[in-house]
Amino acid sequence: TEAILMGFDRIQAGKAKRMLVGSCSDHGVYLWGGFDAMRVLSYKNNENPEKGSRPMSASAAGFVPGSGAGALVLESLESALERKATIYAEVLGGEVNSGGQRNGGTMTAPNSKAVQRCITNAVENCRIKAKDIDVINGHLTATSKDFTEIKNWSEALQLKDAEFPYINSLKSMIGHCLAAAGSIECVA
């Protein structure tokens, strides 16, 4: 997803009118071994794969590894109209967070204050109100920290119960593709 924001910034700055933005991920035992050692990969349902990744569920037992790539054509409105392109979405803005392991964060559970600040800044950068958000594509990985993610969203948006937007997790269907996850999920 960071590639989308980088492309957005270049187009908005007039340095490009159209860009191909996306990412890819690797796969293999050396990549996934560390995650397995941290006990965040699903292993309890190897005989029943449809139960393998269940974010926000009482039976959540880790995520399923995935790999792949995703890319989007991002362009200015003028460029899209000029070439009569089908417009699927509009990028309003966003925010990038880094340093999630500082101040109490870990590799598997980022610093909640930094995450909440990132969400708040993204909403402000998009010039929308939290109540305007219809759906959130969550990071949700079917680990014990899914609850923390929902709590961070709820606190950052100041929305609770029926006001809280729908939240989904495509990782439950395609696996966690690490660096490619955001791009693949945006394409989906």
Question: Where are the model-predicted features located?
Answer:
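Short glycine/threonine-rich loop-to-helix capping motif typified by GTGT followed
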Residues: 101-112, 140-158, 177-184
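Conserved small-residue
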Residues: 7, 35, 73, 91, ...
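Conserved catalytic cysteine-centered active-site region
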Residues: 1-5, 38-64, 152-184
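Acidic, glycine-rich active-site loops and adjacent beta-strand->loop/helix elements
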Residues: 1, 23-28, 93-98, 140-142, ...
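Condensing-enzyme catalytic core mediating Claisen C-C bond formation in acyl metabolism
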Residues: 46-128, 134-135
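Beta-strand segments within the central parallel beta-sheet cores of soluble alpha/beta enzyme folds
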Residues: 16-24, 86-94, 131-138, 163-171
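Conserved beta-ketoacyl condensing-enzyme motif
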Residues: 18-32, 130-153
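Active-site-proximal alpha-helical scaffold in enzymes
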Residues: 1-24, 64-85, 176-188
